[in-house]
UniProtKB/Swiss-Prot annotation:
Coiled-coil intervals: 1383-1466, 1504-1531, 1573-1614, 1727-1814
Biased composition regions of type Polar residues, renumbered to the chain: 262-272, 297-306, 597-619, 645-657, 1175-1196
ANK repeat ranges, renumbered to this chain: 31-60, 64-93, 97-126, 130-159, 163-192, 196-225
Name listed for the protein in its UniProt record: Ankyrin repeat domain-containing protein 36A
Lineage of the species this protein comes from: Eukaryota, Metazoa, Chordata, Craniata, Vertebrata
Alphabetical list of InterPro entries matching this protein: Ankyrin_repeat_domain, Ankyrin_rpt, Ankyrin_rpt-contain_sf, CC144C-like_CC_dom
Protein species of origin: Homo sapiens (Human)
Amino acid sequence: MEDGKRERWPTLMERLCSDGFAFPQYPIKPYHLKRIHRAVLHGNLEKLKYLLLTYYDANKRDRKERTALHLACATGQPEMVHLLVSRRCELNLCDREDRTPLIKAVQLRQEACATLLLQNGANPNITDFFGRTALHYAVYNEDTSMIEKLLSHGTNIEECSKCEYQPLLFAVSRRKVKMVEFLLKKKANVNAIDYLGRSALIHAVTLGEKDIVILLLQHNIDVLSRDAFRKIAGDYAIEAKNRVIFDLIYEYERKRYEDLPINSNPVSSQKQPALKATSGKEDSISNIATEIKDGQKSGTVSSQKQPALKDTSDKDDSVSNTATEIKDEQKSGTVLPAVEQCLNRSLYRPDAVAQPVTENEFSLESEIISKLYIPKRKIISPRSIKDVLPPVEEAVDRCLYLLDRFAQPVTKDKFALESENISEPYFTNRRTISQQSAENLDAACGIDKTENGNMFEDQNVDKEGKALPATGQKANVSPEQPPLFTHTVKDRDHISTRFLGGMDSLTSSEESSERPPLSTLTLKEADPSSKAAMRRKDSPPPGKVSSQKQPAEKATSDDKDSVSNIATEIKEGPISGTVSSQKQPAEKATSDEKDSVSNIATEIKKGQQSGTVSPQKQSAWKVIFKKKVSLLNIATRIMGGGKSGTVSSQKQPASKATSDKTDSALNIATEIKDGLQCGTVSSQKQPALKATTDEEDSVSNIATEIKDGEKSGTVSSQKQPALKATTDEEDSVSNIATEIKDGEKSGTVSSQKQPALKATTDEKDSVSNIATEIKDGEKSGTVSSQKPPALTATSDEEGSVLSIARENKDGEKSRTVSSRKKPALKATSDEKDSFSNITRGKKDGEISRKVSSQKPPTLKGTSDEEDSVLGIARENKDGEKSRTVSSEKPPGLKASSAEKDSVLNIARGKKDGEKTKRVSSRKKPSLEATSDEKDSFSNITREKKDGEISRKVSSQKPPALKGTSDEEDSVLGIARENKDGEKSRTVSSEKPPGLKATSDEKDSVLNIARGKKDGEKTRTVSSQKPPTLKATSDEEDSVLSIARENKDGEKSRTVSSEKPSGLKATSAEKDSVLNIARGKKYGEKTKRVSSRKKPALKATSDEKDSVLYIAREKKDGEKSRTVSSPKQPALKAICDKEDSVPNMATEKKDEQISGTVSCQKQPALKATSDKKDSVSNIPTEIKDGQQSGTVSSQKQPAWKATSVKKDSVSNIATEIKDGQIRGTVSPQKQSAQKVIFKKKVSLLNIATRITGGWKSGTEYPENLPTLKATIENKNSVLNTATKMKDVQTSTPAEQDLEMASEGEQKRLEEYENNQPQVKNQIHSRDDLDDIIQSSQTVSEDGDSLCCNCKNVILLIDQHEMKCKDCVHLLKIKNTFCLWKRLIKLKDNHCEQLRVKIRKLKNKASVLQKRISEKEEIKSQLKHEILELEKELCSLRFAIQQEKKKRRNVEEVHQKVREKLRITEEQYRIEADVTKPIKPALKSAEVELKTGGNNSNQVSETDEKEDLLHENRLMQDEIARLRLEKDTIKNQNLEKKYLKDFEIVKRKHEDLQKALKRNGETLAKTIACYSGQLAALTDENTTLRSKLEKQRESRQRLETEMQSYHCRLNAARCDHDQSHSSKRDQELAFQGTVDKCRHLQENLNSHVLILSLQLSKAESKSRVLKTELHYTGEALKEKALVFEHVQSELKQKQSQMKDIEKMYKSGYNTMEKCIEKQERFCQLKKQNMLLQQQLDDARNKADNQEKAILNIQARCDARVQNLQAECRKHRLLLEEDNKMLVNELNHSKEKECQYEKEKAEREVAVRQLQQKRDDVLNKGSATKALLDASSRHCTYLENGMQDSRKKLDQMRSQFQEIQDQLTATIRCTKEMEGDTQKLEVEHVMMRKIIKKQDDQIERLEKILQHSSLMLQVFES
């Protein structure tokens, strides 16, 4: 039975390969234990105490690495555990399975022991070999009390290894519902995941456990969690076809999203009311970062509000930055503060069930964005609400209010119908202000006119108590319409809607001009305590926005519009948009209103379209009303079937006795990427009020960053006003820095505004900077317009800007129409003719048109009219055309009129058969009366690249004020960037008007930096304008800068036109500084713009023109330029004024650009005016065959009877430097005043740089007028540049160059020397510390100009007076043509390189996809491997059980057979009993017969008859009795036999059936396993190729073996010589060998007899072998050695021959020596056996005992013992040889001796058997030693094998040695010395071979293990 128990216990490897729960108990064997372990096992407490008192190590381990504490816990002995713990036994030691005593106690449910361990500080978080803690085993055992104790003692409920489940997941995987419920109550992490990302819900779904699923759903588990295979629980439910569980998950998900708007609104807001009739609020900065990876979401919204106190209202509009990052084609939406009662659950859609959206569906949803907010309010219109609601209701019924999972697609027809229904009722069918009085409007809007002008709105109730519709929605409310609900949603309305296609966020925040803003702002007089202006803060990093505002005091209000920052980051297809809008009104005697910025950015990717139409109409009547049309900002971005809409609108009303109506400017930028269209519309409105109005327009900064479809933007605006008696106006500085690095963009915008108030009006025009960059076939168009009106008893109207951007790609169209109309008011009407720009671009049969019309009237006896500036930029690439027209017109007023005709500049560039023409015309007419008309300015630019068209229109209009008008035309900068079919346009216009008294106005610095890498372009436009007024009008014409860059055959044209007009009195103006810094760094850009303006006024104005520093540094083909132009005029009664310094620093690494712009201005007034035009320096850098063109034009008129004008000097510098070019141009101008003005000619610096096929063209025109009774007019300069491919020409400049200054070249050199001083001035500015970081790297060396460029400059300087003829111009043209040809050749080379780069990128993308796929496959394989391992373990266990069943069945079968045999023997016994009865019966019959005969003779006849009759009767009775006996016996026997047979048959049949079933099951299982094994073997074949490398390593080891063999060969050669002599002797002995053959035959017969005896002994040894098998591995092998020595002589002979052949191949010579040595040994041993059997037996016994002792220590010692035995045998063999010589002489005696030897051998065999018995008896005593030596068994095996081989060889060669006895006797003496040496060497070689064999075996095991691992991984 003990053997049976041992078989049940698995080995350590089997236990480790199992699941860890199969064999909880320890296999205990006596010889494994030590003293302390035995005491614990037997429960001998006293002995344990004794051992511990004697300082016995309590932590001592037994042979299975177990401590006494392990055994005490396993056997459940708390007393032992307490004693051991009290003796400070270590509690956290581990056994061979890495299990602590605590784990063992919990596993075996020994709660008392476990509690003792926990109370004494045992660590419950230790994991065992399987990665499980004690908590896992407690869960497995479902022991709740144990779990509670473990948790109470600090067990980590989530502790596990990487490859093991957490306890909760473990309970779910084991289907333990109670444990799952218990753990969830104990706050286990319900969303925990395993190493494959699977949650508990996924496990429960795969197992089909409905109860567990319900439990998990009750604890709010994340049903959208995805595992490593990107699947959720619903997917597994679908795969398992488990409808019940799927319905549970679906119902839970539906309910969760139904409750989301009420319970899960992720918005926190704080409100504090305003105190003491005033309220100031700072809206919070809402930063929403939504990152979704692998289907997970994270959203955060925070909003905080703080009020200010006392008579002041300071409001900071919130800046909402939304950064949405989407990866792995997932979509993320962030829900900002939700509107109450929002859209009946339509806005919150589950992401998991989101379906892709088609193009038609998108077109519907893009319309729904505007619909959601239009109809849900009261419309003050003669038409009923039915005109608006029906289409909206249809759309809502179809899309928004349907269930999330069942939204229906919308067809194109339906979309067309809905788009018409929205635009017409909402925009055209509204009541105008003329049909309503102001009171009615206020009443309808719910405006409460109080002293404080505060409008508080509660939920659905305004301050007046007027009930409002409780819709909970905030819609797009028009100026005539009251809001449906008031501001109750945390002062801001953020709506996030997710449409069908995925998680698209739509945020809209809009207000009407008639109701208070969402933040419930109030408007009141400024408090004197708020005089100090807040300092500007540096622009925050990307993703953050900071805005600061301070209002001015007394009868003025400063209202700032919100800064809407939309940063959208899109990765790999998803899109997310967020919009934040803020609204602020201004009231009481003055109103400051800022027009909202409407930015509509529609980005469509993958064949989807987005169209936005926003028409606006406004009229003015009676008491001038101020009306604002709501701003609709819709940013609809769709990528990868997803949509994201963003809507931002800002509205600010102003009221009380005056109203100003400003139409919105609708800017539509359409971006197309991959056949998609994107539209962006930005409009700004500014009204004029009675009294004075301080108005700051909002800064709308839209930074769109795309990185592989990702966007990121940051906007920072700061506003600061100035106070009293003077007005200082700084236009906002809009800096849009778009950085693209590897397709990524980062934009930062900072703007600061400072208004000045009181009896003066300070008006700031908004700077709308839209930087749109498109990469990979995207287009970006941005249009920004700003308009300031005139104030005080006059009406200023600005004509509408109609920008139509139509882009068609792949048959898709996107149209946007924006119209604005303003009528003329009161006694005067000024009409501006509409400016119509029609741009038609065709690509693939597509047409796009744009129309822009503007009409402004002028007021009161004078009319000032400025036509709109329409810039349409068209770029044609690859056979397309490019034209640019720029015109600017300023009017003159009072007794003089100046009319300027439009300047039409048409630049047409063609590459590959295209032409480029440029026309620049300048016209200046003079007019009488008081009409000044300025014709419209039309710029038509057409850009086509790969069939894509983009247009931009920018118009700016300023009106005249109060008998005088001061107008500054806008600076229109159009920067176009094309990269690989991408286009980017930016239009910026700014207009400041002149105001009462004296006004110093600084125009905003517009810095637009755009950088693209790999075919991307950058442009930056910066303009600054300051006007001054005093009973005179100063006009500055707009500067239109059109930069066109064509890449891959595109051309660059620059047109500059300037027009000055003369007016009365004197005026000083400062022209804007246009700073354009363009840098490229592998697609990265960094731009910083800082502008500071400080005005000073005192009847005089001194102007100092700006210093423009543009420094560009490039590494590896980058350029650096620095241009500075300082101007210092002489003044009388001088008041110095420093204008703002815009510094643009663009730093780039690996092609970085650093630019610094410094602009300083000082004006002076009083009867004299010194006017200097700004120096516009435009450096354009083109990399990778890109072109950049920038044009800056400035116009300044001069008045008072004289006008002096200087023409510009054009300097063309071309620098070529290997990779880096740095140019410095320094123009200085100084003018003198007082009656005579000195006229200076502006510098036109054109720097053309060619580096690797790059072009950069820059033109700088400056016009400076002078005064004093004379007017000089200059004709316009017509510049026509035509570029052809292979033959190109350009005419960059045709200008009148009169009165050239000979000192220009000297000034250039002086400026270069003075440039460091200018830098010091720039660095001294506090506001520029952050911006000038990269400007310090600007090079001041002017010697980098190449000789050719200098020669060109000298030619221009020399011929400046003679440039009217064409000869000189042709010379200049020829120089340009040469350079252009070189550039073109390099462009072609760059194109080829680009193609290669694109191919490489495509390959890289393909490889990345493959890598990702392989990684997924690997993860799947790992998962399958683990499952297969578990299956294999389970199969092994099943096979073992089946084997046990078979054994049991066989035993039963044998028992049945024995019973059958017993029954058969009983039958035989009964048959034997019946046999003797039969003869007795026969003898009785014979006696009867004889008796009858006798009776007849004796008796009489009567008696005879009687007797006969009686006899007959007796015989009959006897016969009957016999028959009865026989029948009874037979019946009994038959019954017995039948019963027995039936029982036996039944048993037999049952056994046969059981056997058949078992056989069938085994066959099935074997077939299944064989199929699996076949599959595994097939996979193994694939892995064999991988093993070749490992085989190579094995071959290396073989080479090492060969090196050892070489050494052996050398030794063998030495031995060959010694053996040669021995061979000769052997030949001599051959004769004697023949004689001995007869003796050999006899010996063979004896050997056969001995072999039989050995076979018998062998059978006995096998029996002993089975017994030794359980004793230990060492004893087994030793027993085998002795068994094989006697049993396998013949087998070993055949094996020896094979071995000899193996050795002969490699060791021919060595083997012969070895054979001889073995022969001698065998002879000696045999002789010893024959003569001294007793001595041999004793020696062997001693040697065996020594060997057993030596096995424990060393294997080498045993080998030496064997050698000692061999030597002793040799001595005995010598004596035997002498006897054998005598035997040869006497054969008869030998025969007798052989017979004796046989008997002796039999005795020897018996002795050996007795010795073995003794050894076995001693084995029990040596078990402990053998266990200790088990670790050395591997080494002993090799030694034993060697000894076996020796013994086999000795016995196999026994016969041969007998034949050669006579020969060996003679040679023994000679060979003894040699043999000893050989033996020593042989032993050494054996050791070496053993070591090598061990190494080889280890390597083979490692290879096998690695191959198995590879197979497992690949399977």
